[in-house]
């Protein structure tokens, strides 16, 4: 069963406006299945024989009807150079589709950036809208367009137990379509195989110790949705595992995790405020999918229900995943704001045309919603008074549960299972 993906529109647009498209994202997020919709011929570099042949004759990999899909191109990095050279001599729109679940083993083998010829598209696991776990009552686009008739929905049949399951299940397509009683086991299998590199042709990953990668992931998971410094995470690795970890080794392993598209930190938003209070630039620690963090710590839905403080941090991570996917469809990006005066905003959705929306992420409940709304209004006032930015197009408290409505002060309250792009 195939569920349509929001990234499809981006792929279609890039194929109409670029010679090639490269779709990058973590393993098992659905890249190949989605890209197969657009190919007229394909080659999969998923066997030793195919990889060896592609490395010996990378130009031959390009032979076939266009659009030509080259799956896991990074296993034969010179394919990239051949695609770029072919487009230099015989440019056509939508000629090639490349997919990759990691960066190349040796980045020096890629001699050109591909700018102007190869358009990048980022693909993540499924959002709740894509997995059909969101009714889509509220559109992010409509909030930017300042909708007049805001929908009202009590959302009565959705509770924290539902949210806990979605956090632990993740947005992996195979888990999404599976019956609820086995979905978590499928996600567990994904985690168990994530760092199995014995037969990996990529020496940079094969030389990494899986147990060390898992230790670092666990430390990141313990600091999920926080601005923990790298030094703090290194100290956590040392203390939790009673082993040494020098910064150089940590950086090497961290690069591998980012090259596998597992860690996806959120950068700070800097609106150039005229103030003596500096804006903090430390990124917020996030995962491409929260289920990875859950599995790394052995956290179940029941565990989340027993610790609502941790629940809130893991929920924030899942909410950021969905906001990123939705923002991508609007040509925007998601960042966070925090200054040394303590004012913060969990997510700032910023569009290319300069419009922006401020989002506070809360589990729910009157007090937390009120706290979120107060913080949003304080941020709005500060931005308007002390920067050249316009007022936010919208302010939203994104909740785990509860109904959706617009408050008298203009702040929207929207549960995550009612949001769509």
Language-model features: locations:
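Conserved catalytic/switch belt of AAA+ P-loop NTPases
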Residues: 81-104, 112
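Interdomain motor-coupling "hinge/lid" segment immediately C-terminal to the ATP-binding subdomain
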Residues: 108-226
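Accessory nucleic acid-recognition modules appended to NTPase machines
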Residues: 176, 180-355
């Amino acid at each position: 069963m195939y569920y349509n993906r929001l990234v499809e529109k981006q792929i279609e647009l890039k194929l109409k406006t670029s010679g090639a498209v490269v779709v990058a994202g973590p393993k098992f997020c659905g890249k190949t299945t989605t890209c197969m919709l657009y190919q007229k011929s394909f080659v999969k570099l998923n066997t030793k024989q195919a990889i060896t042949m592609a490395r010996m004759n990378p130009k031959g990999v390009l032979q076939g009807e266009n659009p030509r899909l080259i799956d896991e191109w990074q296993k034969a990095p010179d394919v990239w150079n051949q695609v770029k050279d072919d487009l230099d001599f015989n440019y056509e729109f939508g000629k090639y589709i490349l997919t990759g679940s990691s960066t190349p083993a040796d980045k020096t083998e890629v001699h050109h950036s591909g700018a102007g010829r190869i358009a990048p598209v980022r693909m993540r696991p499924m959002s709740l809208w894509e997995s059909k776990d969101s009714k889509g009552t509220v559109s992010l686009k409509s909030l930017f367009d300042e909708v007049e008739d805001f929908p009202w929905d009590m959302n009565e049949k959705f509770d924290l137990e539902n949210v806990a399951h979605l956090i632990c299940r993740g947005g992996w397509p195979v888990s999404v379509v599976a019956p609820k009683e086995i979905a978590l086991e499928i996600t567990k299998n994904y985690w168990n195989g994530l760092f199995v590199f014995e037969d990996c042709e990529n020496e940079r990953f094969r030389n990494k110790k899986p147990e060390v990668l898992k230790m670092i992931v666990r430390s990141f998971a313990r600091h999920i949705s926080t601005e923990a410094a790298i030094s703090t995470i290194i100290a956590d690795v040392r203390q939790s595992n009673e082993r040494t970890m020098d910064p150089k080794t940590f950086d090497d392993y961290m690069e591998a995790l980012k090259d596998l598209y597992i860690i996806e930190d959120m950068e700070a938003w800097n609106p150039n405020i005229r103030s003596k209070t500096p804006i903090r630039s430390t990124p917020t620690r996030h995962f491409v999918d929260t289920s990875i963090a859950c599995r790394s710590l052995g956290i179940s839905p029941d565990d989340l229900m027993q610790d609502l403080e941790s629940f809130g941090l893991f929920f924030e991570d899942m909410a950021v995943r969905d906001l990123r996917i939705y923002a991508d469809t609007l040509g925007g990006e998601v960042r966070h704001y925090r200054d040394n005066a303590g004012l913060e905003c969990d997510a700032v959705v910023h569009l290319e045309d300069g419009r922006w929306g401020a989002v506070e992420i809360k589990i729910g409940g009157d007090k937390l919603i009120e706290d979120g709304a107060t913080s949003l209004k304080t941020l709005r006032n500060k931005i308007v008074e002390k920067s050249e930015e316009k007022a936010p197009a919208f302010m939203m408290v994104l909740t785990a549960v509860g109904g959706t409505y617009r408050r008298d002060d203009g702040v929207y309250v929207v549960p995550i299972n009612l949001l769509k792009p």
